Swiss-Prot record:
Cited function: NDH-1 shuttles electrons from an unknown electron donor, via FMN and iron-sulfur (Fe-S) centers, to quinones in the respiratory and/or the photosynthetic chain. The immediate electron acceptor for the enzyme in this species is believed to be plastoquinone. Couples the redox reaction to proton translocation, and thus conserves the redox energy in a proton gradient. Cyanobacterial NDH-1 also plays a role in inorganic carbon-concentration.
Family: Belongs to the complex I 20 kDa subunit family.
Organism whose genome encodes this protein: Nostoc sp. (strain PCC 7120 / SAG 25.82 / UTEX 2576)
Binding site for [4Fe-4S] cluster: 58-59, 123, 154
Keyword Amino-acid biosynthesis: no
Keyword Iron: yes
Cofactor note: Binds 1 [4Fe-4S] cluster.
InterPro entries the UniProt entry points to: NADH_UbQ_OxRdtase-like_20kDa, NADH_UQ_OxRdtase_20Kd_su
Pfam families the record matches: Oxidored_q6
Name of the protein in its database record: NAD(P)H-quinone oxidoreductase subunit K
Assembly with partners or alone: NDH-1 can be composed of about 15 different subunits; different subcomplexes with different compositions have been identified which probably have different functions.
Length: 245
């Protein structure tokens, strides 16, 4: 027997140890049986999604239109549930406030695994128009719970909701039992940082003491036809000179 010294370590025949784990079961991700079970399990889940409706604002009106006979979302196997313990999908539609945040997190934690989240509407995703000057609006529901599908719009149409459900079904169809522990909700948490621009408070509680209450702006007095007070005229000229200088 002649030994070939040119063979590398990878080309040499590996010695089989009868005590160790069999090679055929070391990597079960490509196993035919588990692949079939995955497909069957995923098909059953994506064909019978039970959503928990968490509507807080006008976006929920569009979802209510989706329940009607015109769009008929029952064809996707969606059955709305009133209890989070019987739901595997939560659809947040509308503005989420700081006072409402603990209740939303509690509902999400009561849902059994696997569970999914659809963020519906601009107010849910980024805070929307309420994120400008509202101190109580949450700037994105992904700061509270992980989101699987983002559905932008103000509000999104029922056709867009159907498209989001189809995308979620495709995502469920690609799940694997071997990877399920690695893509749990806690491991795919996503959050965005929002750069808030500080502005002076509008409501200071000193409206009765404001200067404009006693001395209206010059433009307003000229538009109404009232004579401009000398003190106001003097202050306006002083401000203009300060800006020029």
């Amino acid at each position: 027997m002649v030994l070939n010294s040119d063979l590398t370590t990878q080309d040499k025949e590996r010695i089989i140890n009868p005590i160790e784990r069999p090679t055929i079961t070391q990597d079960l991700s490509e196993n035919v049986i588990l692949t079939t079970v995955d497909d069957l399990y995923n098909w059953a889940r994506l064909s019978s999604l039970w959503p928990l409706l968490f509507g807080t604002a006008c976006c929920f009106i569009e979802f209510a239109a989706l329940i009607g006979s015109r769009f008929d979302f029952d064809r996707f196997g969606l059955i709305p549930r009133s209890s989070p313990r019987q739901a595997d999908l939560i659809i947040t539609a509308g503005t989420i406030t700081m006072k409402m945040a603990p209740q939303l997190v509690r509902l999400y934690e009561q849902m059994p695994e696997p569970k999914y989240v659809i963020a519906m509407g601009a107010c849910t995703i980024t805070g929307g128009m309420f994120s400008v000057d509202s101190p109580t609006a949450v700037r994105g529901v992904d700061k509270l719970i992980p989101v699987d599908v983002y559905l932008p719009g103000c509000p999104p149409r029922p056709e867009a909701i159907i498209d989001a459900i189809i995308k979620l079904r495709k995502k469920i169809a690609n799940d694997s039992m071997q990877e399920r522990s690695l893509i749990r909700q806690t491991h795919r948490f996503y959050s965005t940082t929002h750069n808030l621009k500080p502005v002076p408070d509008i409501l200071t509680g000193k409206y009765m003491q404001s200067e404009t209450r006693f001395n209206p702006p010059k433009e307003l007095t000229e538009a109404i036809g009232l004579p401009v007070p000398p003190a106001l005229l003097t202050s306006q000229t002083q401000k203009e000179e300060q800006k020029r200088g």
